[in-house]
Amino acid sequence: MAITYLKKSPKTSSTDDTKTTGIVQDLLKDIEKTKEQGCIELTKKFDKYDGEIVVSKERIEEIKKTLDQKTKDDIQFSYDRVRKFAEAQLKNYGQNFEVELSEGLYAGQKLVPVNTAGCYIPGGRYAHIASAVMSVTTAKVAGVKNIIACSPPKEGVGAHPTIVYTADLCGADVILNLGGVPAIAAMTNGLFKNPPADIIVGPGNQFVAEAKRILFGKVGIDLFAGPTEIGIIADAKADPEIVAVDLVGQAEHGYNSPCWLYTTSKELAEKVMKRVPELIAELPEVPRTNADAAWRDYGEVILCDTDEEMVKISDEYAPEHLEVQTENLKWFHERLTNYGSLFVGEETTVAYGDKCSGTNHILPTKGAGRYTGGLFVGKFIKTLSFQRMTKESTELVGAAAARISRYEGMEAHARTGDVRLKKYGYSCLLYTSPSPRD
């Protein structure tokens, strides 16, 4: 058994860029000192935008009136499905409970939404309407009270009108004309009269990703996101045209977007490798430039001897998006374990999940699918534990806790049990016994 690379990536997609880190650290330090004015000046510098940062209610109403109905209908279509899926997640995401662990000792958990979420919505190369739906809707369904949305402004316009419309529809309380590092810093530090975000979610470029990484700890984040990825598992029964189109569909995201094909059919692989450059050549300039570089530098075609090998290599790569176009779909679905989101069968495709089918498109990259999933209602919800006790239950629990503490050499811990045992009329070693380890 062996695998053969018919096309091997000459580069390794990486977000470990010391130059990016230095730039982002300097910008964050500047904003920490200059606050809102720093965000305003950097927005003028980077986005050539010098209008209001906070999108006004009047601007939102203006967009509602001027945006064409078909666009609004399509956004509503996406919103309805993403909301329905998020509601299903919430319904099945654990429960508040309390249980009696022993007589008089009760413990439980309580699910509590974070107070404030910051949602970053990219708007550089493309107007990512769907990212507004994915982040804001999921936070709203989770029960977050304050939702701040940020998206890069365009000169003289502000954030893209469809992004503003979508963020408002999905439940954003405030929308800011901010992008990049200033946006992440503003949401983290509670600028422009907003509370500081407890968590920041949403995709972005390397500067957004690095700002989130640096600020993680001060603020929660959804995940460390790298360039978007696609993996496709395909056998001899797959349609090479559809496989090729789907690879190109993700490659257009950016010059460093990996696209991988795992197949047991050399004939299919060769057809796909021939067709991909042809499809790229037919694209408009911006997506063509992105896709050409992505396929050239980060595209791989891996020939496997068996279905088991395809599962193994796919799980090693743990792609953000994974399509399965094979004869035995159920067999693969049951065995694959590492991916961000799975698209089972030719009938579905990554673009459906990216835009409107309901599952979230904010997903783990760079192999993180080995240990985490994508954005879901649970990212906005804290699972908090609690306990309460009767005085009678202290006799057993207090004594055991005191003994364990002394075994560990933690006398002050032990005495917190002793003082209660003494108060409630039970025997104890209050303040008298050194640790048995001494």
Regions found by a protein language model. Name each.
Residues 1-115:
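N-terminal Rossmann-like NAD(P)+-binding subdomain of aldehyde/semialdehyde dehydrogenases
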Residues 99-165:
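Conserved small-residue-rich beta-alpha loop and adjacent elements
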Residues 169-249, 253-258:
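Conserved NAD(P)+-binding/catalytic subdomain of aldehyde/semialdehyde dehydrogenases
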Residues 175-179, 301-306:
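Short acidic-hydrophobic, aromatic-tinged amphipathic segments that line or gate anion-handling sites
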Residues 203, 223-234, 250-273, 291-302, ...:
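Short loop-to-beta-strand entry elements in the cores of soluble alpha/beta enzymes
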Residues 315-427:
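C-terminal core of ALDH-fold dehydrogenases
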Residues 431-438:
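Conserved small/polar residues in nucleotide/adenosyl-binding loops
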